[in-house]
Curated annotation (Swiss-Prot):
Lineage: Eukaryota, Fungi, Dikarya, Ascomycota, Pezizomycotina
Gene name in the database record: FAS2
Family: Belongs to the thiolase-like superfamily. Fungal fatty acid synthetase subunit alpha family.
The species this protein was found in: Penicillium patulum
Keyword Oxidoreductase among record annotations: yes
Protein name in UniProt: Fatty acid synthase subunit alpha
Gene Ontology molecular functions: 3-oxoacyl-[acyl-carrier-protein] reductase (NADPH) activity; 3-oxoacyl-[acyl-carrier-protein] synthase activity; fatty acid synthase activity; fatty-acyl-CoA synthase activity; holo-[acyl-carrier-protein] synthase activity; magnesium ion binding
Length: 1857
């Protein structure tokens, strides 16, 4: 074959191969799957210049095959020819064998093994000599070039291929490219032209010619900086080079190569020691050797060969002998110097001996104390009282309104349907808090209750009115404790399976407390006795003594008197005599024993009540009928009418959850008492328990104070009482009651096991209880309170050792009874009165709950056990005035034992009852098991599956919901009559999407926490994904296919239902407001806040080493205060700072702002899909903004931002996102890190600008040319942004805008806010017992500054018309936005002004009568009139059009195109008519109130939608938790409402979101706005859960209610958001429910929109889930939607729109310019006019009608004006409304063309019928009067044409004569 043929064939083959290569897909994924999965290849070698495919294979293995390989024991090796040559060829360096350890060579050390090329070598042994030198080669230009590029890109050398140019490597980042080129210029002096376009290898080769082989300025500077910042102190550049030379034998050129490589492997932080530094250098050196192909040898060892530098081993003894004299000399010198300085060198040892002796003595005392008291006692007496931690609850006025509102909605939603005990109880609680504010509030809601909505509303109105009347009656009456709950009894059941269950069931015999009191008074059979029997028996003894009296001495006379007294006592039912008579000889108590001892005639039978009082007699405490009667009367009265404790001060201990004391406490605060209650377990949970109790039960005038307290501590006892009586620093109370119920259990301790806990319990229940009373007595005496003794309710017990096994419990209780005698014998009776209460069996308490199961059996014996409510009722009865008065005369002993004392051997009885129950249970369980076994044998093992209980656990269903669309008939249609067509939708601004990044993740997860206080399962899954705890896996896992969530750390599969239990604790700990986590803020720890302090050096310092450049800089700064000298060996310099030089020394300040709201730990922008190179370049807040933008669009259902350009031009998408500060991390770097000379990116300045974040949004997502406005309003930025965006859209400058705000948390801002005293001091808060989550408490009494936070919030807003056209969801209407400043600051120049300027939103000066413009019906009449005028103008213009064309034709040349002129003019007329109509809508609908001093902006904005100021249901407050802001802001809102005439009692519900999120500054208003949009959609108003006690100052703001819990309403119409920022920024936004927008449409338009929204929601749902799975919620755009050559055309033509490219399926602008829109309706109209003008003897009639002007819902109108055939035709049309309008227009046009006289505007047009011919064209048929009039006028024929546009119908009729 000839050469030329071969050459041709070769060329053809090459072309074909290349074509095949380029045309075919690469299919790397499939290729790798074949190699790795099917072939299971273990060794892969890449041949090529760089490790490209190998890197790809490694990533694939890590993501897909790592677990698979581990399970199948496959070990793979990925090698690359350019760096793994030795491994590929198995060319391993030989290793010398070490001599055996048993025969060491004394003269030589073993040679160190040769280091593997890629492994870090250990430090050399001390005796090792220098390594063999390696041939030195200087670095090349390409080495430096590649290193500088890699270092700037933060990549390894392997990731910077030499075949690529700088332009390719930077990925289009021009700033980064400029930095690299600048570095190259600094390094090499000059560079070739356009070096960025030249591949690195070629660029390096071109610069090699002029390269001198030395490191340049840039590389030297980078190396010097790396060494100084990352090497340990003292290990300088000289040390580094010396080590590389001695350890590895590298010359200066090779050293340069190693150091260049080190620049791309720089440690993350400074290395800790020289050993670490050497290990790091060894690692770098080995990698350098591998890449350079250098064989490094180990250091040469010294030995017999006497190699150069060999080491010598010396005998340690010889060294010791050699240095002995030196050490002795040093010691002598030290002693001489010590004597001179008069120092005792042994002083420390002497002091140590003395301290040891003292320590032994002290330890002996401690050991003795410990041995005597024990550990439990020692820890149990530690004081815990701290008045700083006191919680004061007294805002009953606010909770009353909250409870009333909740009750109102409970009735409306059917949760309360009948007036049961619970409703009555709620009503009583509300009545107890009755006040004028509450009455007005309730009256408004009842007066405006829409009863037409259903029965529940009617019920709410009826019950509400009754409650109002009841509240009015008790307005001046003291609050009372009145329990209306049904008394309950114990019930224990055992089911067929043997399961024991206990519950409280209503007692059938006692339906209310009145019945309960009656039963208690009646007693029972067990407490019966016969008084006649006792009298008879005693009289027998008397008679016997009388008969013997003459033989008795005087002592017998005394015995007679005693017996006589016993008879008297018997007549008074002396209990002490009854018990031995009935129970003395038998263990069986009750009726039977009594019967056996009575005669045939038992006499009168009486009973002792179950609750009774005793009186002290010589025989002890005896039942007293009179006192008992007083007590029972009191309890009966309390059950009927209640019991008041108004004005009483009470001290309670032992009132924990589930205790009797807690129930007593509820009764006291229900009755209006002021109570201080103590808790030994002070925590947030405990204070929340008491706060919830007060919010529920606290009556008017009541107060609850909760303090930490340990009754085991004497110090606490004294401090507590002092706090109560201290008028300056304490409460300043005088106690009326002391209820010391504190106790600890001692179960299981018999007499031989009295331990440390028993002693502590005895101390608590006896010793310190007496101390407590003594302290009260002391304080009363000190303050002179002798006439107001405090009643002490002593908690006595019937257990006097009866039960046993309870340590010193019974002794403690029994010893309290001594107080009955001490009251007489001691001198404190004027200050304290005693009422001992023997507390009976109370079910459910901590002490007795274990006995609940036997309570029913015990009651069957005729005694009574009590519920906690019943026992509390009994005790509260003892605190009634009547019993208090008795106590002031004598101590009172109350037996509340329920008859238990009549049961002998109670413990044995309980044991038998418990045994019987357990035996029954065991038998039934055994029977059930046997039955199951038998069933399985007979029917098979699986036969019982259908009968087993299976709990179905719900799976996570992460929804992506759009706002609920209202029902047309129920919600929209009632509004449609007034609102239809009343606004210009192009001037209405709506919110179509919103998003946020904040401490609680995103807007969805934040709303869950805000509205419900907890995360759902779905919320936990999303939060776990956000925090990087889980990730989605789709592929093989452990040898099986798996698709689902896996743990991000372990890779273990995680079922979605397990996410909440597994991760929720971690999620809650690392979200929200919490202690600052240093890892989120580059190590910032407020406990060690770094500051710099300048000092002047007093002595010359030791020299250190630096580069020449650095040394010269030191010299330049310090002058003669510094000495620098060159080191000849290395070219480095030594630097010595001399006396007088200044230094900045770091110091650590313990800063007190330790808490902040922080984004969730683990939040990572890359998880959303943002590329790593963007993350590394931009400020963190930019990432917040980018994520928010993507999520806001997704919230609007927009999955591709270029979709906007299908509907609007590029110039109509705007960005108004702003910030208070901007990129704080970059600002910090620019000012602080640059000052510290830390390495920073060169373009850091641009990343700090506030508008840079918006620029990134446009560069990566939007590619728009619309308006960009960047508000800076500090804390009000987000609302100011909404204001700017709103105005931008209304002014027509944009149709779509992104609005919102962002800000970060940074230590500098935190410090300066603290200096202003604006933020919450965490140390103070901790001292007050607050947790981080409680530190932001808006509106509370204890609010103490705002809590900083970080994040971004955003909304996507657009015109309503565009939203309807696109079919995006509408979350709300923006009705009004305003901003305002404040007054002059001359007296107090305060930048954070009080915000009163926002009052101007309500500015108006109305006349005597309201403006008619506020009446929407008036405005509709005006609009209809204006529309009629516009129609008439349009008709006239169309009629004149032919004449105008003729005139133009006469004036123009022959080229004049009449048809085109007519078309354009007709289109202009149509556009102008539409414009005029929209202007009319705008002026009479949207804008009528502007510039009118009689109408406030707020009132006008509401009236636009047919609403009033009364329809603002919710106000979201800036609410920063500062003392001034919360008060001022409430005042502003309240004044606005009052000025605008809001109805009395109509209080808005306040939302204070910052309790949860903290204050993010710029993002604050956006988060609040998002929350309000969620309120609009759900109707649920979230409460301020940290509002434990609303400040009393807020009570005067009667137009605001401050909820602390979420309230589900029946719908919210409108909301207000207020925001205030430093710099006198005040802002307010009014938002309205979107149903009012839908009411401006007709039903067909609404249904069409609804269909589009539903389709968009499905698309968004799919995109969202794909984003979670694939980390692709954010997808950056790589290019604009147009080609470069199209740019100017697209920019300059406003009609350009994108369309889907059929090849790429991308949205792009077409290469052809858009054609002018031709209106078909205009064309038809012109044709009709032309025909009419061409016809002689004719008359034209033109009519224009708005499509929605014909009311086809009015059947009378349709019947009068349309024939049946017309009606049938129109109703079958696609749009009946348009068809009817067209027919009506045609009728009007025909009438005008006839030229006959009119019968008036109300005349029917049925006689003019518009039919259709065979082709569907309209035909005129005249009937009746119309036909007669036409005939009379000489009309021969009438024709008509009808055309439609989007909004109107045009008809042209021609009558021929």
């Amino acid at each position: 074959m000839r050469p030329e043929v071969e050459q041709e064939l070769a060329h053809t083959l090459l072309v074909e191969l290349l074509a095949y290569q380029f045309a075919s897909p690469v299919r790397w994924i499939e290729t790798q799957d074949v190699i790795l999965a099917e072939q299971r290849t273990e060794r892969i070698v890449e041949i090529g210049p760089a490790d490209t495919l190998g890197g790809m294979a490694r990533r694939t293995l890590a993501s897909k095959y790592e677990a698979y390989d581990a399970a199948t024991s496959v070990q793979r090796q990925i090698l690359c020819y350019n760096k793994d040559a030795k491994e590929i060829y198995y060319d391993v360096d030989p290793v010398e064998e070490e001599p055996e350890a048993t025969e060491p060579a004394p003269s030589a050390t073993p040679a160190a093994p040769a280091a593997a090329p890629a492994a870090g070598a250990p430090p050399p042994p001390p005796s090792a000599g220098p390594a063999a030198s390696v041939e030195d080669i200087p670095v090349t230009a390409v080495d430096i070039l590649r290193t500088l590029v890699a270092q700037k890109l933060k990549k390894s050398l392997a990731d910077v291929p030499l075949s690529k140019a700088i332009k390719d490597l930077v990925g289009g980042k021009s700033t980064l490219q400029n930095e690299i080129l600048g570095d190259l210029g600094k390094e090499f002096g000059s560079t070739p032209e356009k070096p960025e376009d030249v591949p690195l290898d070629e660029l390096g080769a071109s610069m090699q010619a002029t390269f001198n082989g030395q490191l340049g300025k840039q590389s030297s500077s980078l190396i010097a900086r790396m060494v100084s910042s990352k090497m340990p102190g003292g290990f300088n550049i000289t040390s580094v080079r010396k080590y590389l030379e001695t350890r590895w034998g590298l010359g200066s050129g090779r050293q340069d190569g190693v150091l260049l490589l080190a620049l791309t492997m720089e440690p993350a932080a400074r290395l800790g020691s020289e050993v670490d530094a050497k290990a790091y250098l060894d690692d770098v050196t080995n990698k350098y050797a591998a890449s350079a192909g250098v064989n490094l040898s180990a250091p040469v060892a010294g030995g017999d060969s006497g190699g150069a530098g060999g080491g010598m081993v010396m005998d340690p003894a010889a060294i010791d002998a050699l240095t002995k004299d030196q050490r002795a000399l040093f010691k002598q010198q030290l002693e001489i110097i010590a004597r001179y300085l008069k120092m005792d060198l042994r002083g420390g040892e002497k002091a140590h001996v003395i301290s040891q002796e003292t320590q032994k003595a002290l330890q002996a005392q401690l050991d003795l104390w410990q041995a005597e008291h024990g550990d439990f006692y020692a820890s149990g007496i530690e004081p815990s009282f701290d008045q700083l931690k006191a919680r004061v609850y007294d805002s009953s006025w606010n909770w009353a309104r909250q409870d009333a509102l909740s009750m109102y909605y409970d009735i409306i939603f059917g949760r309360l349907q009948v007036v049961d005990r619970e409703i009555v109880s709620q009503c009583i609680r509300i009545m107890n808090r009755s006040n004028p504010l509450l009455l007005d509030f309730m009256q408004y809601h009842i007066d405006n209750c829409p009863t037409e909505r259903g029965e529940t509303y009617q019920l709410a109105k009826e019950l509400g009115q009754q409650l109002i009347e009841n509240c009015r009656e008790v307005l001046e009456v003291a609050p009372v404790y009145k329990d209306v709950a049904v008394p309950t009894g114990p019930q224990t059941t055992i089911d067929a399976r043997g399961n024991i269950s206990y519950k409280e069931t209503p007692r059938t015999s006692a339906r209310k407390l009145e019945h309960y009191v009656k039963h208690m008074a009646e007693g029972g059979p067990i407490s019966e006795y016969s008084n006649r029997t006792k009298v008879q028996n005693d009289l027998k003894s008397v008679y016997k003594l009388i008969r013997k009296q003459h033989r008795l001495s005087k002592s017998s006379q005394l015995q007679f008197d005693a017996l006589y007294k016993d008879v008297v006592h018997a007549l008074g039912m002396n209990e002490s005599q009854i018990i031995p008579q009935e129970n003395g000889h038998s263990k069986k108590g009750g009726r039977s024993a009594a019967k056996r001892n009575t005669p045939t005639r038992p006499g009168k039978v009486e009973t002792i009540p179950f609750l009774h009082l005793k009186k002290k007699t010589e025989h002890g405490w005896d039942y007293n009928k009179k006192l008992t009667g007083i007590y029972l009367n009191v309890t009966e009265s309390a059950a009927k009418d209640g019991l008041s404790f108004q004005g009483k001060n009470v001290l309670m201990t032992g009132a924990g959850a589930g205790s009797i004391g807690a129930e007593v406490l509820q009764g006291l605060i229900s009755g209006g008492a002021q109570v201080i209650v103590t808790t030994s377990r002070f925590s947030r949970e405990v204070t929340e328990y008491y706060q919830a109790m007060y919010a529920r039960y606290g009556a008017r005038g009541s107060q609850l104070v909760v303090v930490p307290f340990n009754q085991g501590s004497k110090q606490d006892v004294e401090a507590l009482v002092e706090y109560i009586y201290d008028t300056k620093k304490g409460l300043g109370w005088d106690l009326d009651f002391v209820v010391p119920f504190a106790a600890i259990p001692e179960n299981g301790r018999e007499i031989d096991s009295i331990d440390s806990k028993s002693e502590l319990a005895h101390r608590i229940m006896l010793t310190n209880l007496l101390r407590l009373l003594g302290s009260v007595k002391t304080q009363k005496q000190a303050h002179g309170f002798e006439t107001r003794p405090a009643q002490v309710i002593l908690p006595l017990s019937p257990n006097h050792g009866t039960f046993g096994n309870d340590g010193l419990y019974s002794e403690s209780k029994l010893a309290l009874e001594t107080l009955f005698n001490r009251w007489y014998s001691e001198n404190w009776g004027h200050y304290l009165t005693i009422c001992g209460a023997v507390i009976g069996w109370t079910r459910g308490t901590g002490l007795m709950s274990g006995n609940n199961m036997v309570a029913e059996g015990v009651e069957k014996l005729g005694v009574r056990t009590f519920s906690q409510q019943e026992m509390a009722f009994n005790l509260l009865g003892l605190m009634s005035p009547a019993i208090v008065n008795l106590c002031q005369l004598d101590p009172v002993f109350a037996d509340l034992n329920g008859g238990l004392q009549f049961i002998p051997d109670l413990k044995g009885l309980m044991t038998k009852l418990r045994t019987d129950i357990m035996e029954t249970s065991d038998v039934r369980q055994a029977v059930m098991k046997e039955t199951a076994i038998e069933h399985n044998i007979v029917n098979g093992e699986d036969s019982g599956v259908l009968y087993k209980k299976v709990i179905a656990e719900p799976r996570a269903n992460i929804k992506f919901e759009f706002p609920n669309l209202p029902d047309w008939e129920k919600e929209v249609k009632p509004l449609n009559e007034n609102l239809k067509g009343m606004v210009n939708l192009d001037k209405v601004v709506v919110v179509t999407g919103f998003s946020e990044v904040g401490p609680w993740g995103n807007s969805r997860t934040r709303w869950e926490m805000e509205s419900k206080g907890k995360f759902s399962l779905e919320g936990c899954v999303e939060m776990a994904w956000i925090m990087g705890l889980i990730k989605h896996h789709n592929g093989p896992l452990k040898g099986q296919a798996y698709s689902g969530w896996v743990d991000a750390k372990t890779g273990e599969p995680v079922d979605d239902k397990d996410v909440k239990p597994k991760y929720e604790k971690h999620i809650l700990e690392h979200t929200g407001i919490r202690l600052i986590e240093p890892e989120l803020f580059k190590g910032y720890d407020p406990k060690k806040k770094q500051l710099l302090q300048e000092i002047v050096i007093q002595e010359d310092l030791e020299p250190f080493e630096a580069s020449k450049e650095t040394a010269e800089e030191f010299k330049r700064e310090h002058g003669d205060k510094v000495e620098i000298f060159e080191i000849p060996e290395s070219g480095e310099y030594t630097v010595r700072l001399c006396k007088g030089a200044t230094m900045l020394i770091p110091k650590a300040l313990q800063f007190d702002r330790l808490v902040a709201g922080q984004v969730p730990t683990g939040w990572d922008a890359s998880r959303y899909g943002i590329p790593d190179d963007i993350i590394s370049q931009v400020d963190p807040v930019t990432l917040f903004v980018l994520v928010c933008t993507a999520e806001a669009m997704l919230s609007a259902g927009v999955t591709d931002p270029y979709e906007f350009y299908k509907y609007v031009h590029l110039s109509e998408v705007g960005n108004c996102i702003g910030s208070g500060i901007g990129g704080t991390h970059r600002l910090r770097g620019m000012y602080k890190d640059r000052f510290l000379d830390k390495p920073l990116q060169k373009d850091i300045l641009q990343e700090s600008f506030i508008n840079t974040m918006s620029a990134w949004v446009n560069m990566l997502l939007l590619s728009s040319t619309g308006p960009i406005k960047t508000p800076v309003g500090c804390c009000a930025t987000a609302v100011e942004s909404v204001d700017i965006g709103y105005e931008t859209i209304v002014e027509g400058k944009a149709r779509v805008c992104f609005v919102g705000g962002f800000d970060d948390f940074q230590e500098e801002g935190s410090y300066e806010f603290a200096n202003m005293k604006a933020t919450s001091n965490a140390e103070d808060e901790f001292a007050h017992g607050r947790t981080p989550q409680e530190m932001s408490r808006p509106t509370t009494t204890t609010r103490a500054g705002f809590m900083e936070s970080q994040g971004c919030g955003m909304q996507l807003i657009m015109t309503a018309q565009l939203a309807l056209d696109m079919g995006v969801p509408i979350h709300g209407i923006i009705a009004l936005t305003t901003t305002a400043t404040d007054k002059i600051g001359r007296s107090v120049r305060s930048v954070p002004a009080p915000g009163q300027g926002v009052l101007t939103t309500a500015r108006e000066n109305p006349g005597k009568f309201p403006s008619p413009l506020l009446d929407i019906k008036y405005r509709r009449r005006q609009l209809d009139l204006r529309k009629k005028q516009i129609n008439e103008w349009q008709e006239a213009e169309l009629l004149y059009l032919q004449e105008e064309a003729e005139a133009m034709k006469a004036q123009s040349d022959e080229t004049f195109n009449e048809a085109e002129y007519m078309q354009e003019r007709a289109q202009h007329i149509e556009r102008e008519a539409i414009r005029q109509e929209k202007d009319a809508q705008y002026s009479l609908g949207n804008n009528f109130w502007k510039q009118d001093s009689r109408i406030a902006p707020l009132r006008g904005a509401m009236a636009t939608w047919g609403l009033t100021v009364d329809d603002i249901d919710v106000a979201s407050f800036h609410g920063t938790s500062t003392v001034a802001n919360d008060k001022n802001e409430s005042d502003v809102i309240c004044q606005q409402m009052k000025h605008l005439g809001r109805s009395k009692g109509n209080a808005v519900m306040g939302i204070f979101q910052k309790y949860l999120t903290g204050h993010p500054k710029g993002a604050a208003g956006a988060w609040m706005f998002n929350g309000c949009l969620q309120v609009l959609d759900s109707g649920l108003v979230p409460g301020n859960r940290n509002a434990d006690n609303v400040d009393k100052v807020m009570e005067k703001f009667d137009y605001i209610v401050y909820p602390s819990r979420s309230i589900q309403t029946d719908g919210v119409k409108a909301f207000s958001v207020t925001s205030f920022g430093f710099g006198q920024k005040g802002a307010q936004v009014i938002g309205i429910h979107p149903k009012y927008l839908y009411a401006t449409l007709d039903q067909a338009q609404y249904e069409a929109y609804k269909t589009k929204v539903e389709a968009r929601q499905k698309k968004a749902y799919r995109y969202f889930h794909n984003g979670l799975i694939n980390n692709s919620i954010f997808v950056a755009k790589s290019k604009a939607p147009y080609e470069d050559e199209q740019q100017s055309k697209v920019f300059l033509n406003p009609d350009y729109r994108v369309s889907v490219d059929k090849k790429t399926s991308e949205l792009k602008f077409s290469t052809t310019a858009p054609e002018a829109k031709q209106s078909e309706s205009t064309r038809q109209t012109l044709e009709s006019l032309a025909k009419a003008n061409a016809t002689e003897n004719s008359k034209i009639g033109v009519d224009v009608e708005h499509i929605d002007s014909v009311n086809i819902e009015n059947e009378t109108f349709v019947e009068r004006n349309f024939t049946q055939s017309e009606q049938d035709y129109c109703r079958k049309a696609a749009s009946p409304q348009s068809s009817f309008a067209g027919r009506w227009s045609a009728k009007e046009a025909v009438f005008k063309s006839l030229g006959v006289s009119s019968k008036g505007a109300g005349a029917a047009l049925k006689d003019i019928e518009i039919g259709v011919d065979a082709n569907g064209a309209p035909v005129v048929n005249l009937h009746g009067a119309a036909a007669a009039a036409a005939k009379q006028a000489g009309v021969k024929q009438v024709s008509v044409s009808i055309s439609h546009s989007d909004s109107q119908a045009v008809a042209v009729a021609v009558s021929q004569f």
